[in-house]
Design a protein with these regions (language model features):
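Terminal helix-turn-helix DNA-binding modules in bacterial transcription factors
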Residues: 53-91, 113-114
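Short, Lys/Arg-enriched, Trp-marked, Pro/Gly-tolerant hinge/linker segments that flank
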Residues: 1-17, 40, 53-65
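Basic/polar phosphate-binding segments, predominantly the helix-turn-helix DNA-binding elements
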Residues: 34-62, 86-107
Length: 114
């Protein structure tokens, strides 16, 4: 017989749902892995582990990458680093600068000429 406790089911469809949610909500500064875990009623550790296993990178990375993708566009259009940071969900310009350094090895000012 089946065990009475409900096993957390995190299948590909759920991962894609979460990825879509991040793509739609990345500009919310409150968005983080805990918020997502709670929304899908999953434990933080389980969600993090399963997301990384399925997607090849962490859920927090997914959030940062979505923000940086939009930041590239805004910076290319002439937005300041401060304006861009606020529009893509970072509370401070330096958080955007840190994310660029971490994920792309450059600072936003190095992108201006590209």
């Amino acid at each position: 017989s089946e065990p009475s406790h409900r096993k957390e089911v995190v299948d590909d469809a759920v991962m894609e749902e979460i990825r879509g949610y991040v793509a739609a909500q990345y500009s919310d500064p409150e968005l983080n892995v805990s918020v997502i875990a709670e929304k899908w009623n999953l434990s933080l550790s389980s969600l993090s582990r399963k997301y990384r296993a399925k997607m090849g990178h962490g859920l927090l990375d997914e959030i940062h990458m979505a923000r940086l993708k939009e930041a590239h566009q805004l910076l290319a259009e002439g937005s300041t680093v401060k304006e861009t940071a606020e529009k893509v969900g970072y509370l401070e310009a330096r958080a955007l600068v840190r994310a660029f350094k971490r994920y792309e090895g450059v600072v936003p000012s190095q992108l201006k000429g590209k």
